[in-house]
Design a protein with these regions (language model features):
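Active-site-proximal beta-strand elements of phosphoester/diester hydrolases
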Residues: 166-171
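Catalytic cores of DNA base-excision repair glycosylases
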Residues: 127-129
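Conserved active-site segments centered on acidic
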Residues: 94-103
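N-terminal beta1-alpha1 cap of cysteine-dependent amidohydrolase-like domains
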Residues: 1-87, 101, 107-113, 117-119, ...
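DNA-recognition element of transcription regulators
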Residues: 133-137
Length: 195
């Protein structure tokens, strides 16, 4: 079972709601895995839910909860496989020495927005991969291993090589895994790391 962290968002009428994107459900279900949504309400209950999971996805979004840092630290300290996507990667980095800045050239509705050069990545080795991009801020420093950057120098992928699977990507593989072998490799590695 894979836990996906729900993100605070707003309905068209302005009411608060926790959401989990259907594309993430579809991606996990395509691997014959079940999904459990993790909605921040009590850190004790969240840890109990995380302990039931084989791995965790920290999804993208634009609003973090007050529990996010505790959740990520718990995942890290207990060596639970974790894939951070977009904001999820940013939160991973910020907890471990990260510095972030606003940018304005990495938001595109294109399937492939730019290339990322990977270096010593346990997923990709040393190569160039094509990714999508939908972020308005970027990590410029982190204590995690920086293993992928876009051609303009934006950090696009981080790992902790001492963990079973603690990987963050700035792009959205859940929108590419059906059409991109680069995205599929990442998801395959995450699934194969599950306890």
């Amino acid at each position: 079972m894979i836990g996906i962290l729900g993100r605070l968002d707003y309905t068209p009428s302005g009411k608060e709601a926790y959401i989990i994107y259907k594309s993430l459900f579809d991606m996990v279900h395509s691997y014959d895995m079940e999904v459990i949504g993790i909605i921040p309400n009590s850190i004790k209950k969240i840890k109990d839910i995380i302990d039931m999971c084989d791995g965790i996805i920290l999804s993208g979004g634009s609003n973090e909860s007050s529990y996010d840092n505790e959740i990520i630290k718990y995942i890290y300290d207990n060596n639970i496989p974790c894939l951070g996507i977009c904001m999820g990667m940013q939160e991973m980095c910020m907890l471990y020495g990260g510095v972030m800045k606003d940018i304005n050239n990495h938001h595109s509705d294109l399937k492939y927005a730019h290339e990322v050069v990977t270096k010593d990545s346990m997923i990709y080795g040393n190569r160039i991969i094509k990714v999508n991009s939908r972020h308005d801020s970027a990590i410029i420093k982190t204590d995690l291993d920086i293993v992928g950057k876009s051609l303009d120098g934006v950090i696009e992928m981080v790992e902790d090589k001492h963990k079973k699977f603690f990987v963050g990507v700035q792009w959205h593989p859940e929108n590419l895994y059906m059409v991109s072998s680069d995205a599929k490799v990442l998801i395959d590695k995450f699934i194969s790391s599950l306890k």
